Amino acid sequence: MKNSKSKFLNFVKKNPLFKNFYYFYNIYIRNYKFLNNGSQFGEEKFILSFFNKAHKGKFVDIGCFHPTRHNNTYKMYKSGWRGINIDLNSLTIDLFNFARPKDININAAISDNEENKTLYFVDELNTQNTLEANHLLFLKNHHNLKNEEISKLKIRTKRLDKILDSYNYNDIDFMNIDVEGHELNILNSIDFLKYKIRFICIEMIDHNDQAKLINEKLNEILERNGYILEKKIDFNFIFKKINYDKKN
């Protein structure tokens, strides 16, 4: 099934006549029910409640997955916000370029160093693709992922600060980080004195002792840099910069 899907997607990408039709089908037909919902558990609605409706904010979404489905910035985009969407899946970025052309959409794997890493790849448009072997254990145990479903690929990582600097993104209203266990590497690469980030939503899953330790470090970094936990929604933790007030 995976090989058939991959062959189909490769065919679509190489044939412009089919490519746009597939993008339209994926967003507006197959995933039509998500066009009004935005985020999966209401994270986006909660974030937007801190801003006046007229505010046109800036966001950064790392591990953006899909432009509409279970996306924490889609309603922001529809409200006039603009941002940078980053994902290591090329098809994801193709869909963003189709559905959200006013955003900056980048195909990249983000980490704390620029180096070659192993990507545990399941499929295009799959939330289970990960750079972390420990997170792969979680996927196998909790999502019944089989070894034969996983391909090991080499991928070159990029640093987030280089991307932010290239687009002059120093003042950010909302940052979403959902990278399947690689969140600590990204947070470690952020200079919180240089980049003003008002809200950070980060996925944290305590699936084993190593993951718990990593999540403790995530909390320590955010607390040390002036953030408090504002709300927990499912596996997503929303942190707010202390002394932040509603913005016009």
What would you call each of these model-derived segments?
Residues 1-248:
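Phosphate/nucleotide-binding beta-alpha loop and adjacent structural elements of enzyme active sites
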